[in-house]
Amino acid sequence: MEYNFDVNSDAKKFEPYYLKCICTGWAHEGLRANWQKRLRTVQNEIGFEYIRFHGIFNDEMAIYSEDENGNPKFFWQYFDELFDFLKEVKLKPIFELSFMPEAISTKPHTLFWWKGNACPPTDYDKWAQLVKATVIHCVERYGIDDVLEWKWEVWNEPNLGSFWTRTQEEYFRLYQVTVKAIKSVDKRFAVGGPSSSGADFRDNLNYLKAFIDFCSAEKLPLDFVSAHPYPTYWPLDTAGNEQMGYMSKNCNIEHLDLIRDIIDHSPYPNAEIHLTEYNTSPSPRDLIHDTLFPAPFLLYNLTQNIGKVDSLGFWTFTDIFEENGPGESQFHGGFGLMNVLGIRKPSYFAYKFLADMGSNLVYRDENCFATKKDEKLHILLWNYCYYSDALQAVTEAPYHFTAVMMCLKIRNFHLQFILKTRKQLKHTNLAGITAVHCIIGSEWEHPKVLPRSRPLS
């Protein structure tokens, strides 16, 4: 594999959309000192613009309650502590409006270890009061200029029964009430949804289309659309149990093309596209997350999808993430760029390298990304090998790694330079492996089978 570059090559400006948004699990986790320490490191070393998380209206945040007469009461202490910190580290929210406070929740249906209420409100007027009071409080505390740059996302994954217990039409009503409440404070605020996901990406797209059609029919504002393009699906095994499977190598490229096409040909062609969750899988106990594989996976997909969407938020920056409860070990297959102790995983360095690359494109392909920054040529190389069929099967075969010879030739480079090698920068060794069916870690040195990830319940 040979690459030839000329330092004098022309470069094309692009928007580094992959640095727009980083994600985390649950608002209340953001009050913890170790969570804040990890996020401060991420911002110092990488630097994202937005952050997105679940559960700002969970009862642990104590925002909403009612007096003895059933009138809404609002409490902002924990909210202010969290958002003051986010402002300190230069992050703006993609503000996911979830979940339902127990005081106005219909028959409780909770999900996750921290029990988010995935139900519609008993009283849509009280929900509107909560949303409007939150927006007004944000304007009063942080100023209209700051809040105008925020994004307001209505709910999370309402097309999945575990996240929304009622019908599609009921979610559309929630969006209608919510967007009107927000726009009543200032019509310039950016509001969107539906934050759809799914075991089958076609279901995700169908929900998105129906949502856009509803907004158009009701003449509702739609400033951005959001979705979650995980590269997985959930087929049934021979016993009828769901098992996580992996789509094709280029599924994310195809999915983002489809979303882009839907918006371009919709009544909202100028709507932004924010993909507010993304990872190699939607399982918080997928041991692949702790291996080398996510790094070349990210480098390939993030560089190949430049120019298609406005953000693609990595889920999540830390393994301090408790949807399934606290992680059982230091490396438990958590989503994070860092583990619970703050150890940077290979996925972390994928983002770190991209952050160092600048935003003037010289060249890209499956294993290479070249840019110019400050009149300097930056070249990033990796070896991207997708999942093998053996990932899903028992195998007695030894594991094989495929070495790739890369020849790099640079013309018109007259200054002294140092090509940093693997020995000099160990963390730059992000080469993929042909068969990703071994796990790195003391507990998993010689596994014969990967533990199968399970869908969230």
Model feature map: region roles:
Residues 66, 70, 114-122, 162-166, ...:
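Short coil/turn segments at secondary-structure junctions
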Residues 138-142, 162, 215, 260-263:
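Structural motif corresponding to the C-terminal cap of alpha-helices
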Residues 168-312, 330:
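Noncatalytic carbohydrate-binding groove/subsite architecture in carbohydrate-active enzymes
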Residues 1-110, 114-151, 169-195, 220, ...:
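Non-catalytic accessory regions flanking glycosidase/transglycosidase catalytic cores in CAZymes
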Residues 318-320, 326-327:
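Secreted, luminal/periplasmic, and some membrane-associated catalytic domains
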